[in-house]
Amino acid sequence: MQTVTPHTYNTMTSKKDFWKLLAQKGPIVALAPMDGYTDSPYRQIVKKIAPETVVFSEFYSADGLMHSKELQKKALTHDPNEYPLIIQIFGKDPHAFAEAAKIIEGYGITGIDVNMGCPAKKVVKSGHGSSLMIERETAFHIIEAMSHAVQIPI
């Protein structure tokens, strides 16, 4: 399988075709996002062991990324060896998602994963995570807003 590096990713004709490119090479091997675990040092270890792995970050708040330079630095600073790197974000406000997506793209991240699966009560109670599976219109507006805001895959 071809390893996607910042160079190969940046020379792709359409960054939104990232997943298609990977699928052509064979099965996609991915490290799922895990809150409290998939930080940069952990992702770097995984990439040393299995360079073909697509790694995901812990999940970060779209609102938090939009408003906090400190969170942006913590969440989005990464080692070039982590490519391809997908940042997972959560929230419920399409505008916040679009703004966070622009920030994420500005850091040279490969793509964005919208958290629609977290079943934690405190996450669901606030309208985030798996609650978006029920609030399909909100989920649609989130994806739509992000798709118009950035060129990277969502």
Regions found by a protein language model. Give the residues of each.
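N-terminal amphipathic/basic-hydrophobic helices that include classical n-h-c signal peptides
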Residues: M1-T11
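Structured C-terminal cap/extension of enzyme domains
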Residues: V4, K16-K25
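Glycine-rich, positively charged N-terminal anion/phosphate-binding segment
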Residues: Y9, T13-W19, M34-Y107
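Extreme N-terminal starter segment of soluble prokaryotic enzymes
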Residues: P27-V29
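Non-cysteine beta-strand/loop elements that form the S-adenosyl-L-methionine
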Residues: S57, T110-P119
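Active-site-adjacent beta->alpha loops and helix N-cap segments on the catalytic face
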Residues: L65-Q72, A120-A145
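Alpha-helix-loop-beta-strand connector modules within alpha/beta enzyme cores
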Residues: L76-P84, L132-I154
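A structural preference for short, pocket-lining loop segments at secondary-structure junctions
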Residues: E105, I112-D113, V124-K125, G129
